[in-house]
Amino acid sequence: MSPATVTIDTTPDFSNGGAPHSTLLLAPPAMAAQQDAMAAALTDAAPLGSRPELYMLDRLAAGLTNLAPAAYDLVLVLASGADPLLSRRDVFAKIADAMKPGAKLRSRDGSPLDAAIAKEAILAGLVESAEGAYEKPAEEVAAVPLKFLKKKNKGEGGGPVQSPAAATQPTAPAPAAAAKSLPNGVVMVDLNDDFDVSDDEMIDEDELMTEEDLMRPIQQPPECAPKPGKKRRACKDCTCGLAERLEAQDKARRDKADKQLQEKAATPFKLASEDLNELDFTVQGKTGSCGSCALGDAFRCADCPYIGLPAFKPGEEVTILNNVAQL
């Protein structure tokens, strides 16, 4: 006689009835050489029903590692202080997308996160909780009903109410498109309708001030008044007309100076004999007006005719041969 078939149930007798708790560990590049520290972090983050995963921040920033969207319930940062990779906005956006709604981000040791990291967490849409962690809020989609105004001037039969004067006049046939009833929620808009905005309400800005207003003297503010002993200047955002007035005065002063220079340029300038003898050092006892022409270029005036010549003694004859001074 063959034995009866025996069925063995391999399913666990006790089950928590929920998905395993996923934990994401983010380690800086400097922690790659510390194998013991990473093993301890994985051990601490692996309680009953937890599934920890360790990723390096440099590989995540370089795009060599991709995180699954909405896959982690807890994100632990193993960096103790400020980390430049974790402060990058593109890296933090990937971390925020990988968090489930209601997931939390905090440091492993429970210390507050760096200010730069906390700023990026808030910009990524996370909300700071009372424990110092940053939680991803759950998003809800809600429908907003739109309310439309009821049509006015309706009779009991649903037709428009006509005035007695309009009832005696023959009504024009309505267009075929307007005769059709519109479904609920559909509103017909006339593009030629100006929505009861009359042209009389438009104000011409040129008519705001009359000729009498323009002829009134400008009231100068006290802060624009010239201070004693100082030159009068206009403000950067001058509105009292002082800037235009000073600019006109400067233009008139420049035009006058240019005119005087043109008049002097048209008249040739001639030196008298006594002016030439004053600078002629071949004459014994004659010196220049400054008395420093013979000392060299360092002591000569800007318009001295001896610029470029070496120093010489007063009374010594100076000749130029082949562009070379001969003393």
UniProtKB/Swiss-Prot annotation:
A molecular function annotated in GO for this UniProt entry is: metal ion binding
Q: Where is the signal peptide?
A: none
Which segments carry the region annotation Fe-S binding site B? 290-304
- Highest taxon of source: Eukaryota
The main location class comes to cytoplasm
Q: Where is this region: Disordered?
A: 1-20, 153-179
**Compositional bias annotation for Polar residues:** 1-14
Region called Linker, residue ranges: 145-214
User: Which portions of the sequence form the region N-terminal SAM-like domain?
Assistant: 17-144
Q: Which GO terms describe its biological process?
A: iron-sulfur cluster assembly
Which Gene3D superfamilies does the annotation name? Answer: Fe-S cluster assembly protein Dre2, N-terminal domain
**Entry cofactors:** [2Fe-2S] cluster; [4Fe-4S] cluster
Kindly state the subunit structure of this protein. Answer: Monomer. Interacts with TAH18. Interacts with MIA40.
The protein's name in its UniProt record? Fe-S cluster assembly protein DRE2
| Originating species | Pyricularia oryzae (strain 70-15 / ATCC MYA-4617 / FGSC 8958) (Rice blast fungus)
In the UniProt record, the gene name given for this protein reads: DRE2
